[in-house]
Amino acid sequence: MKKRILIVSHAMEIGGAESALLGILENIDTEIYQVDLFLMRHEGELLKFIPRNINLLPEIPEYTVLARPIKDVIKERHFLLAVARLYAKYKAKVFDKKKKYTESGVAIEYSHKYTKRFMPTIQPDVQYDMAISFLTPHYFVTEKVQAKQKIAWIHTDYSVVQVDTESELAMWKPYDYIASISEDVTHSFLKTFPSLKKKMILIENILPKTLIEKQAEELVQKKFDTQTTNLLSIGRFATPKNFDNVPDICKRILEKGINVKWYLIGYGGDETLIRKKIDEADDRCM
């Protein structure tokens, strides 16, 4: 009888963590393990690359609204979730003001923390041998999944993010193991949460071979200006990635007489901020 594994993540938009997840899914031996994948939203450019031998579970409406505007949550009559998210936003603002943080990482953590009580159980009739929470926040796998062992993944360098350490410690503690993608990530994480050292394991990212091969074969339509230096940055538009400073950096490079164009590809909550910074700086960043 096959061991049953559940992996929980957000969506499959372009990003390093999502690509790493594809690498794991490609390399799991499905002759030995039966793998269920629960995505809160069936969205993203990488969704089509999920291997066919992986069982993609149906969406659950309550989970799909977590990343959508609160007005949409109200329209879909998820009133308790809307109230919980409003409360989470309020608590995040209070925390940031108290700590004098300009923009911390607590907003999304609080969003999951205060909505979890209203979320339905994922696969209520199944007890898994192992459940993996692949992206933070990690509340739902601990409280909404039945499994003999539970693992939370960490992709973030904690030396560059501002978090509510007391709240997050309570989030991480219930897990049997915490999988870090690198020694540096482990080091920064343990500086913040030294008491979790015994739970740490190292599992480096696995490149998704199929995805890379398919993308390498695709024709690139964009024609670049050969008379300038073209730079390209790809990633999630979030505070730790520092994309919002790229327009100013690009402007400074131009002021030094270097002919450059800087292209940004990605998605995320900082997109509006980045576009504003581009308008303020120079259209050579796009």
Describe the predicted segments one by one.
Residues M1-K3, K214-N230, L254-K256:
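Nucleotide-sugar donor-binding and catalytic loop/hinge architecture
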Residues L6, K223-K241, P247-C250:
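Conserved donor-binding/catalytic core segment of Leloir-type glycosyltransferases
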Residues A11-M12, I234-A238, I253, G268:
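Short donor-sugar binding/catalytic loops of nucleotide-sugar-dependent glycosyltransferases
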Residues E13-I14, I32-E103, M200:
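N-terminal strand-loop element at the rim of the active site
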Residues L21-I24, I28, L231, V246-I249, ...:
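A structural motif in glycosyltransferase catalytic domains
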Residues L39-G44, I234, K261-L273:
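Glycosyltransferase donor-sugar binding loop
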Residues N55-L57, T272-M286:
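Nucleotide-activated donor-binding/catalytic signature segment of Leloir-type glycosyltransferases, i.e.
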Residues I151-H155, S159, K173-Q215:
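Donor nucleotide-sugar binding/catalytic pocket of nucleotide-sugar-dependent glycosyltransferases
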